[in-house]
Design a protein with these regions (language model features):
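N-terminal subdomain of nucleotide-sugar transferases
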Residues: 1-61
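Acidic donor-binding loop of glycosyltransferase active sites
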Residues: 104-107, 171, 298-315, 330-331
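A short, well-ordered alpha-helix in the C-terminal region of glycosyltransferases
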Residues: 360, 367, 374-389, 398-401, ...
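Conserved donor-binding/catalytic core segment of Leloir-type glycosyltransferases
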Residues: 6-8, 221-246
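Carbohydrate-associated surface elements
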Residues: 179, 200
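Conserved acidic donor-binding segment of nucleotide-sugar-dependent glycosyltransferases
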Residues: 346-347, 351-358, 367-373
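Nucleotide-activated donor-binding/catalytic signature segment of Leloir-type glycosyltransferases, i.e.
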Residues: 261, 268-295
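Short hydrophobic beta-strand element within catalytic cores of glycosyltransferases
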Residues: 306, 324-327, 331-334, 344
């Protein structure tokens, strides 16, 4: 298993996102398994941090893709449509060719979006190197929810066409959810080259801990049960909706508090909802906290809530954060969108409510908040599942067969 693997990423650590966390743990687990991985992130990360051209994280070298002239810098920094996308693809392709000529690799493993995939595919084919493409999400759907494009727009259709082009020409394709694989089959992708590697978690980092009483006192939590949301505040995560739902839950007589840990584009709407409802006494917005302290905030939350809205993206893509909560043995309450249903078995490893339905949310939340025994049972079973099926050490082994298949399929 000493294959030399070049991972091609949109962005990587120290950028903090679900995307970068999956990459970090996956690549580190591959290294410990005996692979020889290295990673390259695209030029969009270079825009944010032009001085960091190379770093080493957990024994793996991460490199950047710098601009190669004024035109590429202008096209990318000024966000010129089409020209920007073309510049990203060209820069990634040329950077990969440069790297593999100086330090040969056995396989190129690109991760969505399609711009990373297309640049990596072109480089792989020019050098006769097997190529694996991994889909984390269909990024055009995220752009729709962020009001950047419409589903009938040229850019939406172009993004889908580019994705299909890369997928159909890859030697092997990985999807992080079964729903993504089903969508690829619908788009006439050869099922024989499709593989499933779900999100995982570092079970050694995320293991059950006692309540951090010092933090609880600092936050003034008292003895009321605490709902927690820990994650990025994208619109599709539904956190502003959650604020209103928790206010209604309390109005109906269920005692609780809500902690919101994280930041993102929906923060203004979340703050506005708290102000409008005069909910500051029982809802605290803590913003982003240091990653190495995140377990402390999990420890003071009795129930972790994942209130995703039902849109195309959330029906297809599995979130990462619930797995952290499961590894910690926490009770989970989530909306019944497809991405969460793939992680949570109702009444066994958590509870689900009908997405965007306040009445159902209040009913299920009341059960969890008022029954400590139920919380313990669900949390214990959730951790058992994670230890058995979602440990990155276990999931990384799936790439042995995936890479073997890609090597066999090269040129077919």
């Amino acid at each position: 298993m000493s294959l030399r693997i070049l991972h091609v990423l949109d962005h990587s650590w120290p950028v903090h996102s679900g995307y970068s966390i999956r990459s970090l743990h996956l690549i580190a687990a591959q290294y410990r398994l005996g692979f020889r991985p290295q990673a390259l992130s695209g030029p969009l990360q270079f825009v944010d941090d032009p001085n960091a051209t190379e770093t080493v994280v957990e024994n793996v070298t991460y490199r950047r893709t710098p601009f190669d002239g004024k035109f590429s810098e202008w096209a990318i920094s000024r966000r010129r449509p089409i020209l920007r996308e073309a510049a990203v693809v060209r820069l990634i392709r040329n950077r990969i060719v440069e790297l593999v000529e100086n330090d040969p690799v056995d396989l190129i493993h690109a991760h969505s979006p399609a711009l990373c995939g297309l640049g990596a595919l072109q480089a792989a084919r020019s050098k006769g190197i097997p190529f694996v493409y991994e889909l984390r999400a269909f990024w055009e759907d995220a752009a729709v929810d962020q009001n950047k494009i419409g589903t009938r727009s040229f850019r939406y259709r172009l993004s889908q066409r580019l994705e299909d082009y890369v997928v159909h020409r890859a030697d092997a394709v990985v999807g992080i959810s079964q729903s993504i694989l089903d969508e690829l089959k619908r788009r006439k992708t050869d099922p024989a080259k499709l593989f499933h590697v779900p999100n995982g978690v570092d079970v050694e980092k995320f293991s059950p801990v006692s309540r951090d009483e010092a933090l609880a006192a600092k936050l003034g939590l008292g003895r009321e049960p605490v709902l927690g949301f820990i994650g990025s505040l994208y619109r599709w995560e539904g956190v502003a909706w959650l604020v209103r739902a928790v206010a209604e839950l309390r109005r109906r007589g269920t005692s609780c508090k809500l902690l919101i840990v994280g930041d993102g584009e929906e923060m203004p709407a979340v703050r506005e909802a708290v102000r409008d409802l005069n909910a500051g006494e029982f809802i605290q917005i803590l913003g982003r906290v240091p990653h190495d302290e995140i377990e402390r905030y999990y420890s003071v939350s009795d129930v972790l809530v994942y209130p995703r809205h039902s849109i195309r993206l959330t029906e297809l893509v599995t979130p990462l954060k619930p797995l952290e909560a499961m590894a910690l043995g926490k009770a989970i309450l989530g909306s019944d969108v497809g991405g969460i249903r793939e992680l949570i078995e109702p009444e066994k490893t958590g509870l689900l409510y009908r997405a965007d339905n306040v009445d159902d949310f209040c009913m299920q939340a009341k059960r969890l908040l008022e029954q400590a025994g139920l919380r313990r049972e669900l949390g214990a079973r959730a951790r058992e599942i994670v230890l058995r099926e979602k440990d990155w050490k276990i999931l990384a082994r799936r790439y042995v067969n995936i890479y073997d298949s890609a090597i066999r399929n090269l040129g077919l």
